[in-house]
Amino acid sequence: MIILPAIDLKEGKCIRLYQGDFKASKVVAEDPIEVALKFKENGAEYIHIVDLDGALTGEIKNLSIISYIIKTINIPVELGGGIRNLNTIDMLIDAGIERVILGTAALNNRGLVEKAVKKYDEKIAIGIDAKNEKVAINGWLNVSSINYIDFAKEMEKIGVRNIIFTDISKDGTLKGPNLDQLKKLNESISCNVIASGGIKDIEDLKVIKEMDVYGAIVGKAIYSGNINLNEAIKIINKESSK
């Protein structure tokens, strides 16, 4: 299982939200480039970045910082937030983004997903953010009537190979992920599933690993000191080699 440390960008700074609430945001680091370098030093093989300004406005706002991070750290980066059209996807892939995450656009524009997957295959991921098992969009401000598993199955039929699943009620809480929903999703589709939201300690990571989940995104637990990234990566890799 791969551990992806998270950087959420707002106005050029690293912040963390609580349950997806932009009003409950807290700056955790002034310099995201320094954070990314620290993640690399601690053994990260992949970094998860969200442009929160982009998620709200529908267009990437922190591209210069993101581009600099890619050039500086030289490890794969996946990016979500405000990616709504093929031109933006093209631009991001050209800029060196390894995997582009579509969220709102995937729900509102199935045609875009089809075109993107046809062109970029596994470089496209779908971010499914759920509230009470329903898919939320537009920076989590609006909740649809679509069940998260039904949506994941639909994406799989299109050819999507990577799904990032977040239970919004758990995100930023350090109260543990929604293991029940994660398990159901992982058993319902054959895509790579990446767990996100609420992961609080190494024990959570071990449980997710046992579910045969492809990856886990860790944010607040690293910034709060609950998880030592270097130690977590070593432990999970050791478990993988058993």
UniProtKB/Swiss-Prot annotation:
The record, for Pfam families, names: His_biosynth (PF00977)
So where does this one cross the membrane? none
**What name has this protein been given in UniProt?**
1-(5-phosphoribosyl)-5-[(5-phosphoribosylamino)methylideneamino] imidazole-4-carboxamide isomerase
Q: Which reaction does it catalyse?
A: 1-(5-phospho-beta-D-ribosyl)-5-[(5-phospho-beta-D-ribosylamino)methylideneamino]imidazole-4-carboxamide = 5-[(5-phospho-1-deoxy-D-ribulos-1-ylimino)methylamino]-1-(5-phospho-beta-D-ribosyl)imidazole-4-carboxamide
Q: Which InterPro entries does the record match to this protein? A: Aldolase_TIM, His_biosynth, HisA_bact_arch, Isoase_HisA-like, Isoase_HisA-like_bact, RibuloseP-bd_barrel
EC code(s) of this entry: 5.3.1.16
Listed SUPFAM superfamilies: Ribulose-phoshate binding barrel (SSF51366)
Q: Where in the cell is it found?
A: Cytoplasm
Q: Which GO terms describe its molecular function?
A: 1-(5-phosphoribosyl)-5-[(5-phosphoribosylamino)methylideneamino]imidazole-4-carboxamide isomerase activity
Entry keywords, A to Z: Amino-acid biosynthesis, Cytoplasm, Histidine biosynthesis, Isomerase
HAMAP family attached here?
HisA
One of the record's GO cellular component terms: cytoplasm
Q: Where is the active site?
A: D8 (proton acceptor), D129 (proton donor)
Q: What class of enzyme is it?
A: isomerase
NCBIfam families membership: 1-(5-phosphoribosyl)-5-[(5-phosphoribosylamino)methylideneamino]imidazole-4-carboxamide isomerase
The question of whether Isomerase is a record keyword is answered with: yes
Pathway entry = Amino-acid biosynthesis; L-histidine biosynthesis; L-histidine from 5-phospho-alpha-D-ribose 1-diphosphate: step 4/9
Q: Per the UniProt entry, what are the Gene Ontology biological process annotations, in alphabetical order?
A: L-histidine biosynthetic process; L-tryptophan biosynthetic process
Report the family membership: Belongs to the HisA/HisF family.
Say if the entry is tagged with keyword Zinc.
no
